[in-house]
Amino acid sequence: MPFPPPAAEDGPIDLEHLRRTTLGDAGLEREVLGMFLMQAGRLVGALAAMPPEASALAHTLKGSACAIGAFRVADRAGELEPAIRDGDPTQALAELDAAVAEARAAIEHILSRP
């Protein structure tokens, strides 16, 4: 089941969802966004090699993305899980990479603000 799309002004990160999740604590928002950047980079790097635990890695990324409001990333990670099981993850992995890159750019922009 796809997650709700982010509001247009939020781009790849649903900032309202993030604010609700962090109870409006701006410092916590920045902290979880930074943690997501590190985790997403590590998981996407691992997924590129398609290790035996790739489906679990995609599921972990889906949950983390959902928590911060990166619903496109969550959707793409969710689509990767069955693609891995079906033995043809190439397209799904490329779409996940693109969604993560978009979220990363948005997060870096958010974190660059004072």
Q: What positions do the PLM features span?
A:
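Long, amphipathic alpha-helical coiled-coil segments characteristic
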Residues: 13-60, 67, 89-111
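Intrinsically disordered or compositionally simple regulatory linkers and C-terminal tails
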Residues: 1-10, 114
